[in-house]
A protein has these predicted regions:
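Beta-propeller domain segments
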Residues: 1-126, 131-137, 145-147, 151
Length: 151
């Protein structure tokens, strides 16, 4: 499982292309499309036809635009209920350059629930670092401690 980012501020209107995504595959050497394709299907105009999005492995889970996922970990501990074991936790550092109308995203730890190799839910796991417009913190990394706690 790996995180794939997308390019930000592309073109004269400084648009974002696609969302960051979580990708996985059965082996190494797979083509997830980056940097030619974002979100598996959205071609990056900077590269033209240099890469083909039709052959890229689709992401397992699209993440919120501008969430800035900086760490991805499988929960391997035993402190939390068994339903969390083997699930994916993502430190979302958060947006800083979105328009006020678009709102801020990230500033949380998210959970991607898996059933086998399929993502079945993407939801907040730890929140509270964004209070209105005030930023109280921005998650950067995750560590599952030997006792199963999450740092």
């Amino acid at each position: 499982m790996r995180k794939c980012s997308r390019r930000n501020s592309v073109g004269p209107k400084r648009i974002s292309i696609g969302s960051p995504s979580l990708s996985a595959g059965p082996g190494s050497g797979l083509d997830f499309g980056f940097p030619y394709c974002h979100g598996g299907t959205i071609a990056d105009p900077q590269f033209g036809s240099a890469g083909s999005c039709s052959t890229a492995v689709a992401p397992v889970q699209a993440l919120e635009p501008h969430a800035a996922p900086l760490a991805v970990k499988f929960y391997t501990g035993r402190m939390f209920p068994a339903e969390y074991r083997g699930q994916v936790l993502i430190a979302e550092h958060g947006s800083w350059n979105r328009s006020k109308a678009a709102g801020k995203t990230g500033y949380r730890v998210s959970l991607v629930r898996l059933r086998g190799n399929e993502a079945v839910a993407y939801e907040p796991f730890i929140e509270g670092w964004l209070q209105g417009d005030e930023v109280l913190g921005r998650p950067v990394d995750l560590l599952v401690a030997p006792d199963g706690s999450l740092l």
